[in-house]
Amino acid sequence: TYWYCWTDKIQENNLELTELFNETVGKEKGIHVTAEYQGTYDECHQKLQAAFVANEMPDVSVMEISSIRRFAENGVIEPLDSYIEASGIDMTDFYDALLLNGQVDGSCYGLPYLRSTPIMYYNNTLLKEAGYDGANLKTWDDLKEMAVAVHEKTGGYGISQYSYIWTLDAFMIEHGSSVLNDDETATNLNSEAGKEVIGFFRDLIDQGVVHAFNNTESDKVTADVQNEDTAIWFSSTGDLTKFSSMADELGFELGVGFIPMEECYGTPTGGCNLVMMSKLPDKKKEAAWEFIRFMTDTEQTVKSSIKTGYLPARKSAGESETMKAYFEEMPMARVALNQLTYAN
């Protein structure tokens, strides 16, 4: 059994790849995988905790990267080192910034699957109405200038954003800090970096330039985008196909870029890895590993990236002829991959 999260293109990708596994590797090795939808990451994690207590766990699950340490330390998920070694997988083929999130105390507990960074999206049609081009939006000063201009000249919002700790972390990283301290025991929000980042957006909110929402209202940002009431927003690279389709349907010019820089460029990474549950009998563990290995190999990584807009987690995938052709067709998809250079 395989537990996955999210609907739309992500759900389609999970179901298609699971079916492909069953028809190929699964058929050859006598393994059949049933994919089961579990809602959001938080909902899935809560169900995993309950299933662990009840000893009714799936065999494989997606796991949002910030939760891997907690589940590993509590013995819920299995270290994968012995399977990796026996399979001879070249772990250097995974981008370092994505691979490290799956490691806890020197052991690997998850392989990168649907991985992402936050990126800047913009409605270039609105920016051009205000006399700017989003391709030139590189710094915090640019961000403020363009956002204010859109608000003053079009009456819309320069930026729409819900309270998204991931985006906040990107801006903190650009100040040489992060939302949490290195031990993840306290926040850095009262540091000079935190005060500067929060103050920057607080001023723009007070001016009516930023349309701000709480952390459960991401749909309201999407509504602003659909209504063409906002010029700039920050979201996952995994949303690229969604916003690209929206722009095509509504007829506005969509652009994407790095998170605007202050002292330097910077970004956290996000998304999910694939993990194996503990407490499984050996035969189930072997089957679970075959599925994880299949889902994260180069060919499936390419398919997942093109289908969903998530990053190609393997170098061999990112450099494949298929991905190169896709990047030619969809240059915006390359932005997040290039931004990995600055990932924390």
Where are these regions (language model features)?
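Long, aromatic- and glycine/proline-rich binding clefts that accommodate carbohydrate-like moieties
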Residues: 254-257, 306-344
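Periplasmic solute-binding protein
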Residues: 66-81, 97-135, 161-184, 268-277, ...
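A structural signal for short loop-to-beta-strand junctions that line the ligand-binding cleft
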Residues: 50-51, 56-59, 87-126, 157-161, ...
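Ligand-binding "clamshell"
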Residues: 71-79, 105-107, 174, 243-261, ...
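Conserved N-terminal structural module of periplasmic/extracytoplasmic solute-binding proteins
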Residues: 1-73, 85-92, 261-264, 283-287
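Extracytoplasmic/periplasmic substrate-recognition and gating elements
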Residues: 23, 28-32, 130, 199, ...
